[in-house]
């Protein structure tokens, strides 16, 4: 028995009302962590099967020319989702305490990358900050690279 599983699931669908598997506000990151937390909170169990392997080849579905664009997307959504998850499951004070400390670190990393003229890194960090701030302000997970 485990607390969290990512990537591959076999579930008893009858345990879920109205197919409420996923929180539709979350996009890309923390979906499985959120689902696992809700499963455990409802007194259900999560098990892993040791002799079954799955493989996830990250970013294999796109052309390499989109790598940087996808890194920006990843930077934005990971930080948005992390704050949202913490706020949803541990409360607003816990979420803001964690996020404010991380935001300060991000600002210092951003300034450092600007000083050393690492513009690609600066932009990635800026997207991390942007995603985190949007979540902290209660904005939805709206960033999509093909729309922005």
Q: PLM features: residue spans?
A:
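A short, conserved alpha-helix in the catalytic core of glycosyltransferases
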Residues: 3-53
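Flexible, glycine- and charge-enriched loops at secondary-structure boundaries
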Residues: 25-29, 68-75, 122
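Active-site donor/metal-binding and catalytic loop motifs
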Residues: 42-69, 82
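Non-catalytic, C-terminal membrane-associated alpha-helical segments of glycosyltransferases
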Residues: 73-81, 92-148
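Short alpha-helical functional segments enriched in proximate histidine and acidic residues
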Residues: 85
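Alpha-helical structural context
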Residues: 88-89
């Amino acid at each position: 028995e485990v607390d969290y599983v990512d990537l591959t699931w076999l579930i008893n669908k009858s345990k879920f009302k109205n197919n409420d598997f996923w929180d539709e506000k979350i996009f890309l990151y923390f979906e499985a962590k959120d689902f696992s937390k809700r499963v455990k909170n409802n007194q259900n169990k999560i098990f892993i099967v040791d002799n079954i392997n799955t493989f996830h080849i990250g970013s294999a579905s796109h052309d390499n020319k989109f790598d940087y664009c996808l890194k920006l997307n990843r930077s934005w959504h990971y930080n948005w989702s992390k704050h949202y998850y913490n706020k949803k499951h541990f409360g607003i004070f816990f979420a803001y305490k964690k996020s404010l400390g991380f935001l300060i670190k991000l600002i210092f990393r951003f300034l450092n990358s600007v000083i050393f003229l690492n513009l690609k890194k600066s932009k990635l960090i800026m997207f991390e900050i942007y995603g985190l701030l949007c979540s902290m302000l209660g904005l939805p997970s709206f960033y999509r690279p093909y729309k922005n």
